[in-house]
Structure formats: C-alpha cells, structure tokens
Amino acid sequence: MEKRETFVQAVSKELVGEFLQFVQLDKEASDPFSLNELLDELSRKQKEELWQRLKNLLTDVLLESPVDGWQVVEAQGEDNMETEHGSKMRKSIEIIYAITSVILASVSVINESENYEALLECVIILNGILYALPESERKLQSSIQDLCVTWWEKGLPAKEDTGKTAFVMLLRRSLETKTGADVCRLWRIHQALYCFDYDLEESGEIKDMLLECFININYIKKEEGRRFLSCLFNWNINFIKMIHGTIKNQLQGLQKSLMVYIAEIYFRAWKKASGKILEAIENDCIQDFMFHGIHLPRRSPVHSKVREVLSYFHHQKKVRQGVEEMLYRLYKPILWRGLKARNSEVRSNAALLFVEAFPIRDPNLHAIEMDSEIQKQFEELYSLLEDPYPMVRSTGILGVCKITSKYWEMMPPTILIDLLKKVTGELAFDTSSADVRCSVFKCLPMILDNKLSHPLLEQLLPALRYSLHDNSEKVRVAFVDMLLKIKAVRAAKFWKICPMEHILVRLETDSRPVSRRLVSLIFNSFLPVNQPEEVWCERCVTLVQMNHAAARRFYQYAHEHTACTNIAKLIHVIRHCLNACIQRAVREPPEDEEEEDGREKENVTVLDKTLSVNDVACMAGLLEIIVILWKSIDRSMENNKEAKLYTINKFASVLPEYLKVFKDDRCKIPLFMLMSFMPASAVPPFSCGVISTLRSREEGAVDKSYCTLLDCLCSWGQVGHILELVDNWLPTEHAQAKSNTASKGRVQIHDTRPVKPELALVYIEYLLTHPKNRECLLSAPRKKLNHLLKALETSKADLESLLQTPGGKPRGFSEAAAPRAFGLHCRLSIHLQHKFCSEGKVYLSMLEDTGFWLESKILSFIQDQEEDYLKLHRVIYQQIIQTYLTVCKDVVMVGLGDHQFQMQLLQRSLGIMQTVKGFFYVSLLLDILKEITGSSLIQKTDSDEEVAMLLDTVQKVFQKMLECIARSFRKQPEEGLRLLYSVQRPLHEFITAVQSRHTDTPVHRGVLSTLIAGPVVEISHQLRKVSDVEELTPPEHLSDLPPFSRCLIGIIIKSSNVVRSFLDELKACVASNDIEGIVCLTAAVHIILVINAGKHKSSKVREVAATVHRKLKTFMEITLEEDSIERFLYESSSRTLGELLNS
C-alpha cells in the first residue's frame, strides 16, 4: 500500500528523480518491481490522481523545454549537448519517456467507469509532439508510436488521430527497414487507413508510400504484407488504377516466382470487394491482364508474368465460388475475338488462355445453354487444330490432351475419338512443322495419366511407330519420352507400339539425348538386375545377335541405370561365358576344376546350343562389351582397389588363351584394349611384343589395330619406346651420319629393318590427337621431345625442295608425307608451348620462325614464279599455308598468342592475300579474325594503343579480303558465288563477334562500312549498265539483289542487333557524303527496302530513309533535264522513300 502511494506521489516536478527511478526499476529484469502489477493494484481514485499528475508533469516539462527548441539543439551537434540547454533537453526527454512508459502501461488497466480525461490529454500531447522529435530520439519515438498503436487497438477516444500517426510512422519505417516486424504491426492497424481522406492534399505522401509498398519485396513475400496490400484496393476507387499501373510498370523487374504472390493480392482484393470497387478491380485490373495476356508478344519479358497472374485465377475457379462466373463474364468480350484475330501470335496467346481456363462457363446458365456453350468451345478446339499457324496448332494439341485427360468421363465418345484421331492421325505427321509433331508426343503423356484412356490409345498409338525415325531430333526425343511414360503407367507394351527392331536401329545411330532415353526404355529387357546373372548373359548375347552396334550403345549408357557392382558382375558373367565357349571348343575341361569353374559352366549351359567361338561376330561383340563396361566404371574401380585387382587378375589369367583362340582382327582390337586397362606386368608376354608388332607394320596398311597398341603402351607408361621407334624412322639434319648402333633402351630396335617415316607420322598424329595419349607423350623427357620436334622440322627443307626443284624428290619425307610432317611440327610446337608456357615463348618462337620461313621461302618463291609452274605445285603450297593458318588460329583461340604474335599473323595474312592466287584460305582467315577480335579483350597486359592498332589491322585485313572476293566476282561470277556461299558461316560469326564485343568502336564502324561499300558498288554498277528504264524496278525481296549483295545483306539481316548497327552506319555514310550521287543513293534505297522486308524490321529504317531522302532532294534540278537513267532513278527513289516514310 505504501509503495503504491509513494509511486503516485513521486509523479511530480519536485520528486521527479524518484519517479524516474521507479520506471528504471521496471525496465530491469532482475528487480522484482513491476509497473503493470502496481497499476493493476491501484484504486480508481489513485489511478485518476496518477493520470492527473502525469498530465501536469508532462505539461510542466514541455513548458520549460519546448519541443521546437530540441531541433535547434540537435542541429548544433553533440558539443552543444554539454551546454545548459543541451542537458535540460536530455533531462526533459528522459522524463517524457518515463511518462510515456507509464501511460502505455496504464492503457491496459483503463476501466470505462473511470475518468481518464487526463490520460487522454497526455496521449493527445504526445501524439502532437511525435513529428517534432529529433531524428536521434528513436527510443522515445518508438515508445510514443507503441502508445498510438495500443490506443488505436483499444478503440479509445481520439483513436483516429493516434491511429493515423501510428499508421504513417509504421508505414514509413516498414519501407526503410528490411525486417518484417513493422509490416506485421502495420497490418494490425490497417483499418486506420480509412481515417485518411483520399481527396485531401495531405494524403499525397501516404499515396506515394502505399504505392511503394507494391514494389517492396518484404510486403510481397510476407503473408501480412499481402493482406495489407489487398486491403488497399478498398480505400478509394481512384486508387485502384494507380495501384494497377504501379504493378504493371514493375512487372518486368519482378522475379517470375513472385507472380503467384502478386496474383494472390489481386485475388484477395477481388474476393473482399463489392459494388463499384469490385467492378473497378474486374474491369481495370483482371480484364486488363486478360487483354495483355492475349495481345502482348511472346518475346516480351512481361508476357509470361501476366500469364502467371491469370493462371492463379484459373486455378481458383474450382475452389472459390464466383470465380468461374467472373472469368466467363470478363473473357467473353476479348477471348473469342482473340481466337479469330488475323494476327497469328494473338490467336496463339488466346488459345493458351482458352486451354488453361477451359471450360469457360457461367454456372448459373440453364443446362441447355450450358451444353450449347461447351459445344461451341469444342468447336473452337477443332479450329485450333486446323489453324494455319504451327504455334496455334501446337497449343490446340496441348488443349486437346489436357482437356481429354481431365474430362474423359464427361466428354461424348464421338468428340473424344474425333479429337484424338485428329491429333494422332494427322498432326503427328504434320510435315510443315516439327514443333507440331513434337507437341503431339509431349502432350499425349498427359492423357496417359487417365487410366480410362489406355484401351483407346493402345489402338491409336501403334500407327505412330515411324515417328521414332523422324528427321527432327526433338520429335524423336519426345516420342521416346512418350514410350517411357507408357511403360511407367503400364498403359500398353511399349514394343507393341514401337517394335524392338526399330528401337535398336535408332539406338545404333541416334544422338546422345535419344540414345540415353532408349537405353532407359529397354534397360530392364536386356539387363534385368532382379533376375539371376545367367539371364543377364543370355540377354546380352541376344542383344549382340540382334544388333551389334546397338548393343555397344546400350552398354555404353548402362552404368547410368544401375549400380557399378552390377556392371562389374556383368563383366565377369560375360568372362565366364567366353571361358565356357573356349572349353567346349577344345573339348578338354580341366581335371582339377575349381568350384568356381563348375559354377561358370553351370551358368552358361543355357547358351550351349546358340553360342560358339566360331561365331566371330558374337565373340567380338562380347569382348567389345567387356571393354565398354570396364571403361564406364573405371573411375569407380579406382576407389575399390580390391575389386580392380580381382578383375585384373581374372582377365590376366585368361587373356593368353583368348589371344590363341580369338585370332580375327575384330576380336584382337578389344583384346588389346583390355590389356591397356591392365599393368604391363599382368600380361608380360604380350607387353614385350607390342613394340615389335608396331615396328613390323607395313606403311599404308588400312587397318587401325595400331591404335589400341599405342593406347596400351601409353597406359603402361612406355611412351618412351614409341619415341625411340619413331626417332629411328624419322629423318634428321645429319641423316647421313646416323649410326647403326642399337638403342640403349630396354627394347632393342635394330636398323637392319627399313625406316618407315610415314608410319612414324601416323603414330605421332594418333598420340597428339587423343588427349590421354597426348598427355603421356608430353610427359616424356624434354630432350626427347625436342629431338622429335627437330626431326619433324626437317620437313621444311623437303617442302622447299618439292617447290623449287622441278620433278625433284625430297631428301627425307616423301611428297605425301612432307606436308603431314610439317603440320605435326607446328602442332607439337604449340602443345609444348602450352605445356612449358611458364618458361616463356620458347616453342611459340618456333612457330613465329615458321611464319618467317613461310614469308621468306614459300611466299617469295610463289611471287617469282610463272602461273604455269605454280599450277604443278598448287597442292603443296596450299597445304603449307592452310596448315600454318589452322595452327595459328588454334593458338589465338586458346589464348597462347600474345599481341605481337597476332599482329605478325595479320601482317602475314595480308602478304598471303597479295601473293597467292585463289581463295582457299578465306574461311580460315575469317576464323582468325573472329578469334583475334574476341581475344583482344582477354589480353589484359596489352595497352589501349596496342589493342586499337591490332583491331585496326583486323579491319584492314577484312577490307582487303572482301575486295579480293569482289574482284573474283567480276572476273569469275560463278566461282565467286560459290566462294562467298562457302564462307557464310565464318563471315557471320566474325560480324557477330565484332557486333557483340566492339559496338560503336572504330573496328565496328570500319567493318560495317566495308560491308556497306560492297553492295553499294555492285548495285550501282548494275544500275549504270541498264539501258531500259523498265528494268529499274526497286527490289521487293533479298533474292532481287545481285549475287554479291544478296550474300552480304543476307548475312546482315540474320541478327537484329547487326541490322540496327548496319543502318546506323549506312545513315552516317550518307550524311557524310561517303555515299553520294543519284545512282549510289538509289543503291542505298534498294538496301533499305530489302532490310525493311526482312524479319528484323527496325525503327531505324525510317531514320535512314529520311536521311537518304534529304540527300536526294539536293539533286532536284535533274527533273529539269531531259529523260535519262539518273532522272528516272531520282524520281523512282524519291517516290519509294516517300511511300515508306508515310506508311
């Protein structure tokens, strides 16, 4: 009792220290004093006295330290806080905070019979000073804000003012902070919004903040935030349009995953609305989404998001009353019109919405009207299937499959059968569009989910079997996916729909995406892991006998569908089978047969009558499968040393016997490959004879059994033996002084046998071409690799000899081998540069030396010779140049060529164009330009000046090349046309590279001006040759241009970005008088017309047309002259441009 009285008396100006101490004790968790308990125990009289004292104290504090002075003190900074005014302000704020805390606690103990006028006055005062508080007083602001929220929630007098204050403060804070707590608190007092008058000017700031909430992720993601946003639609009917406009403007930046939340906001707003608000939401928002869902282009980033919103409403129609009727009413004026629109994309968009929303009906309609409406919609489905636009037909297929799957029981059987026959009987064989055929097989699995469809589909689907052989990969993929679905749902036996023979033929030849699916389809048929292992072997033999190549592909992907242990078991099961076949062939079973061997014989008795070692194809197939299976689990076996050792030992024990029995080359190759998986010590007799076998091969032999032998030596770490062999065969600079002494290596190679340089080149090329073997080769001693490089370099002297000596024979390599050796020399030098790049440009400099050799020896020789002499040696010098350019292109592509190397290469390319007749190098040169254009961004060490100089040279090389091609057109039109068509791909890639990496740079503008000059010159030349003005009709299509221009412009219009840049440059050329005169300007008009007729129409066409039109007007005086070609061109071009600009 005494404590309560003491507390009440402490609320005064004289005892303010004690009052503050009481409040402080309440804040300390360790102290037993509780302000809430104390207030709850106060009598009515004590409460009223306390509240009056609080009001008096608050008034006194504010009179002594007015709030407007606080802002001044705050502005003067922290130093001013130490002054008398600053300390007084601090004390005042502390007292007001304590008063606010007591008032906040008092709200919960207010009784209606009590007089709380004094408390109300305190709340009004605190509410009034809230906005005037300095920014630094967040603690007091928060406390007063909590008081306003609590006062609003209790519904006490003046709650509108406190509610508005709390609403604004929470709204502002929720947008500034990233926590969701303020959003939740704002939702609790969202009714306070209706205290604001929408039409008053003071509500402007509120509107802006509320609209900002619609693009705030915290509000969109949080449940309370979405509830709050949906309630804002009910504030004022005029605010709805502002909300919808804000959301539409932000759609492009919102993630697609958030669209379901946006749709939920609209849906909740619609569900709660009534009267004019409901009408506005439906007409201004939902129907607006419907309109844009139909009319927005598919490529628009907003289109898919609009559809997400509409999908949400479509899915709600079955669970929420009124949605179905609303969709029917809102779609009615726009959807059916969209389905009949002339624009095919609009029809396609409308079809998508129609299919998703089907059936679109008003549940309030009478049965007869409802049936009529549904019948009309089925007719729309039929019309979609017959639409001339493939995308609409594809959407129709989707609709038929979704609708029949969902409403199978309710649909009339005749309609059902007719629709499915249309899909499977006609559209599955739509020759005009692979997308339509693909849609059939992508959508049919939807119907399979309905078990009632299985009997009918079992009759219809076998007619589609040949779709497995469709010329479109995506159709084949979709067809196999459908077969997988049939198998999964057990709708039918998949081999009755598509016979196994067809499946195996596709498995043999098809691409990886199709093959992997086919393996998944037939996996359990040929590797039934749940059955005994002898069955695995039987199925394996069956598959090999049915289709050898398909068996290889099947087991190549088998490891993806079962455990590695099963693959290892299958390897040994096949080994048991081969062992049993050999035993039957020799008819001498071992006397002391082990228990395991007994099991082996038992396992394969089923195959006794069908399998024999004399069946070479089957034996080879089984051996190949062992190799394929071993390769597929090689990495897994590395982690299971015990299993790997067991497998090696088992095969090591039987391989000698296999080599004796299986003597056919088809069997030898997989046997050699098997040995390459094992260490040399496991097969010592064979490993010792490999190098002798390689040495004894004849040059020019067709078979490639040497490949597996080389693989063996590389896997055994014996690449040094190969190097010794080829070193003895390759010519050297001191060939005459070569000693006949045998090699000091473990394998002795004698010189009594003839040298075989061409075979040496075959071996080296194989090692360099295959990554694993190349790695082994490059890990050989550096000295041996350098010696090999030197030996290959002797090919240069042979090539010089072939060119310079009429009918002469090379000293080392033959005429056929010399270019090959030269190519290997170049390739090896680059591989060595990559391997030892940390040591500088040791090997790259060798390639640079090769470039100097090409320049000084080959190009200078060509320049000095007569045409007749060069014809005899054309093949040789073309091979040299092609080899050099190919290797240099690869050097730049992998980033080994620095700025200096690239610059030398470009200069050398100019030399080749000036010296060599013919254009065999053009494709390679364009590839080089493309790579340099891209690599100039990667070389970070180059200065800006070096890069600019390099790109300038790129542009010069390109210009020179195009000039050479243009000259060839004039001299030999047919040859020039063939050349240009052959280089379309690299030319397009080069232009695209320049466009994507160097837009609005000198090289970009230079390349485009070169591309402009060619067509302008050719078209101008053609126009000048015309004698009859009737032949001067403007072109309507690309095919109307002359051949050179047709090729170049055809490449330009493939890319919309290139078209825009090309038009910008054309405009600049016209404006700067680079293109001048009536004839050249007419040529520019022809180019503009062709681009405008293409698929990448650009707004820039009008800009260029206007510029050309202005230039043409400067030649207006020609209309005063007599009839001439130029006058006709002027009038025709002016008329054409006028029509274009006014269209």
From Swiss-Prot:
GO MF annotations, alphabetized: bHLH transcription factor binding; histone H4K20me1 reader activity
Keyword flag DNA repair: no
Keyword set, alphabetical order: Cell cycle, Cell division, Disease variant, DNA condensation, Mitosis, Nucleus, Phosphoprotein
Coiled coil: none
Name of the protein in question: Condensin-2 complex subunit G2
SUPFAM superfamilies with a match to the protein in the record: ARM repeat
Domain of life: Eukaryota
Residues recorded with modification Phosphoserine: S30
HEAT repeats by residue range: 460-498
InterPro entries linked: ARM-like, ARM-type_fold, Condensin2_G2
One Pfam family linked to the record: Condensin2nSMC
Primary site of residence: nucleus
UniProt gene name: NCAPG2
GO CC terms: condensed nuclear chromosome; condensin complex; membrane; nuclear speck; nucleoplasm; nucleus
Phosphothreonine PTM sites in chain numbering: T805, T1119
Functional description taken from the UniProt entry: Regulatory subunit of the condensin-2 complex, a complex which establishes mitotic chromosome architecture and is involved in physical rigidity of the chromatid axis.
Subcellular location: Nucleus
Disease: Khan-Khan-Katsanis syndrome: An autosomal recessive neurodevelopmental disorder characterized by multiple congenital anomalies affecting the ocular, renal, skeletal, and sometimes cardiac systems, defects in urogenital and limb morphogenesis, poor overall growth, microcephaly, and global developmental delay.
Species whose genome carries this gene: Homo sapiens (Human)
GO biological-process terms attached to the record: cell division; chromosome condensation; erythrocyte differentiation; inner cell mass cell proliferation; mitotic sister chromatid segregation; positive regulation of chromosome condensation; positive regulation of chromosome segregation; positive regulation of chromosome separation
Quaternary structure and interacting proteins, as annotated: Component of the condensin-2 complex, which contains the SMC2 and SMC4 heterodimer, and 3 non SMC subunits that probably regulate the complex: NCAPH2, NCAPD3 and NCAPG2.
Keyword Zinc: no
